C-alpha cells in the first residue's frame, strides 16, 4: 500500500512539473532595427547570441528584422527612456557603446544603430 501511495505521489509530481515547464516556454518576438547594414551584429548586441537576424524588403531599402526568444510580458516597471553617447567607432563599436551607456545612464544598455552613413550609439535606460 505504501508503494502505491509513493507511486501516485511521484506521478502527480511529474505531471505538475511537466505542465509547469510547458507554461514557461518563451515565445518568439520580432523587432525591426532599421536599415540592413551590420544587421547580425546589431541584433546580437541587443538580444544575445541566440537571436536570428534577417534582411528583407525592397532592393535598396532592405530592413533588418531580429527574431529572439522572449518570455511573457513583464509587469510595468516604469518608463524606458532613450538617449545617446555620440557615434560608434570602428575600433570598438558595440561593446564600447554599451559600456558608455552604462556609465552615462543608470541601468543603461547601448547598441549601435546605422542611419545612412552614420553609426550612432543609442542607449535605453529606466527613467
From Swiss-Prot:
Residues 1-26 form the signal peptide. InterPro entries: LCR (IPR039641). One of its GO terms (cellular component) is extracellular region. GO terms for biological process: defense response to fungus; killing of cells of another organism. It is found in: Secreted. Belongs to the DEFL family. This is Putative defensin-like protein 180. The gene is LCR58.
Amino acid at each position: 500500500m505504501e508503494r502505491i501511495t509513493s507511486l501516485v505521489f511521484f506521478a502527480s509530481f511529474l505531471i505538475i512539473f511537466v505542465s509547469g515547464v510547458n507554461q514557461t516556454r518563451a515565445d518568439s518576438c520580432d523587432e525591426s532595427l532599421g536599415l540592413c547594414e551590420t544587421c547580425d551584429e546589431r541584433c546580437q548586441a541587443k538580444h544575445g547570441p541566440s537571436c536570428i537576424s534577417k534582411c528583407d524588403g525592397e532592393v535598396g531599402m532592405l530592413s533588418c528584422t531580429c527574431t529572439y526568444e522572449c518570455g511573457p510580458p513583464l509587469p510595468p516597471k516604469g518608463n524606458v527612456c532613450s538617449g545617446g553617447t555620440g557615434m560608434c567607432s570602428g575600433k570598438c563599436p558595440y561593446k564600447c557603446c554599451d559600456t558608455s551607456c552604462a556609465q552615462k545612464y543608470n541601468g543603461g544598455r547601448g547598441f549601435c544603430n546605422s542611419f545612412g552613413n552614420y553609426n550612432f550609439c543609442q542607449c535605453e535606460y529606466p527613467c
